[in-house]
Amino acid sequence: MRSRLISWAWGLLTPVLLAFLWEFFSRRSIAHAYAFVPVADIWRSFWELAGNGDLALNLWATLRSALLGLSIGTLLGISVGASMGIIKTADVLIGPIYHMVRQVPLLGWIPLIGLWFGTGVFSKNLIVAMAVFYPMALHTYEGIRNVEKPYLEVGEIFRFGRWQRFVHVLLPNAWPYIFTGFSNALAFAWVATVGSELLFATGPGLGALMLIAQSASRMDVVIVCIVTIGIIGCLMNFGIGKIRKWFLGWHCAH
């Protein structure tokens, strides 16, 4: 218990030092105070946004977009990755296109997506789904293709059909890869959601709130949004780590 408290204390040392350094720069001049907003102003803005409901409204909108894009991208990614891993024809037909398309940076698709679908909610969700799709498809494919030979031989002994072989042999052994892909996809989904809100500033969202605050020279609000995005991202990463540890531990035990 004592060692854990010491570890927590050391972990808080860097943020505290950064806060003191930030406050030091904010007091150097008026120009510095604009770029490095005093901590007291940031704290005051946080309570202002929390009190009037703006922070909760925009945070929920961003979370909703991230979860929707994450769900769609995960389902499509697992489906396509599994198809390429199981069906040789699908690998031949889809594989080259997939590996070529995933080399294009996501930002490279923004002009076309905006031209084809406009700058509304659909475009934002599409960007998030694409960000999730790539790692999910790749890790599912790698997980299925790297199943060890003895497990495949067990399926042959029991004369499993293609579906039984997938459910009872390939998918269970691919779960570690899939969870690794999901961990990456979750981070990509969160970043892509905020990025799409900054690019397509339509509707509520933390990214849209940051743009409005920037145009109004409210850098304190911008900092509140940035800190909120970072905290939620860390909580997501912590949560998926716990779920991964529990699920894979339970799966291995069974």
Model-derived features: positions:
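Transmembrane-helix boundary motif in ABC transporter permease subunits
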Residues: 68-98
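Short cytoplasmic-facing helical segments at TM-TM junctions of multi-pass membrane proteins
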Residues: 139, 143-178
